[in-house]
């Protein structure tokens, strides 16, 4: 049975929040280090590069693992890391080379395991919703960011859609621009590639 908490306890509760600033504060607010986020969009719109930008920014606050199930250790992943200047973060971001669900769970049970895990993608991991709930329950002090393909303008598949509905923050990527929705306020867009975003959205200078 769950706890019944008084209003005073609820209002006095403290949470582990990340002190975002600049464009990330404007986009997301000051989020908790818990639960799930989602990044979704069509191919060739900047989705992977944005996920790398997010990994780099989150590494200012904690350790980040990027589980690349689609591409693994590859030239395209290397190029994405170079594009966002990932060299600056040192050992605070690690790439997991196509690590499956079971191995990821074992890793997260170790001491000094990553605080944030980016799973790229929901579809290539073959994640079930029960496994998703298991991660949330077993690791309540970690943040999971799920990258998803799309069908139309929504995440592809029932599992991805259920994660999307449950996520505290999600970013829709289109035309090299991220459109966030956050339970922590925010809401301002972030450009993955400003020149291409302006061209796509018809804002380029004449």
Locations of regions flagged by a protein language model:
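Phosphate-binding/switch loop-helix module in NTP-utilizing enzymes
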Residues: 95-147
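Conserved P-loop
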Residues: 33-102
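Short, well-ordered alpha-helix to beta-strand connector turns
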Residues: 34, 61-62, 114, 141, ...
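Charged, amphipathic alpha-helical linker segments immediately N-terminal to NTP-binding catalytic cores
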Residues: 1-15
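Short, surface-exposed basic-aromatic patches at helix termini and helix-loop junctions that form
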Residues: 57, 82, 110-111, 134-140, ...
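Pre-Walker A adenine-sensing motif
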Residues: 15-32
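Phosphate-binding/switch region of NTP-binding enzymes
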Residues: 137-206
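Short acidic, S/G/P-rich loop/turn micro-motifs used as interaction or catalytic elements
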Residues: 45, 72-73, 101-102, 122-127, ...
């Amino acid at each position: 049975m769950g706890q019944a908490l008084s209003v005073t306890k609820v209002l006095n509760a403290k949470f582990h929040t990340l002190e975002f600033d600049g464009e990330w504060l404007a986009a997301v607010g000051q989020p908790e280090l818990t639960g799930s986020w989602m990044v979704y969009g069509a191919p060739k719109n900047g989705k992977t590069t944005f996920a790398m930008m997010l990994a780099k920014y989150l590494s200012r606050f904690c350790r980040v693992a990027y589980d690349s199930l689609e591409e693994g250790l590859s030239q395209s992943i290397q190029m994405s890391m170079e594009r966002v200047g990932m060299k600056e973060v040192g050992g605070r971001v690690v790439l997991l080379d196509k690590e499956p669900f079971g191995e990821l769970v074992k890793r997260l049970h170790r001491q000094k395991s990553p605080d944030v895990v980016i799973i790229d993608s929901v579809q290539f991991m073959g994640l079930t919703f029960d496994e998703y709930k298991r991660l949330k329950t077993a690791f309540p002090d970690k943040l999971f960011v799920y990258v998803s393909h799309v069908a139309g303008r929504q995440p592809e598949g029932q599992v991805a859609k259920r994660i999307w509905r449950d996520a505290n923050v999600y970013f829709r990527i289109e035309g090299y621009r991220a459109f966030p929705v956050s339970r922590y306020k925010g809401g301002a867009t972030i450009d993955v590639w400003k020149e291409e975003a302006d061209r796509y959205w018809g804002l380029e200078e004449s």
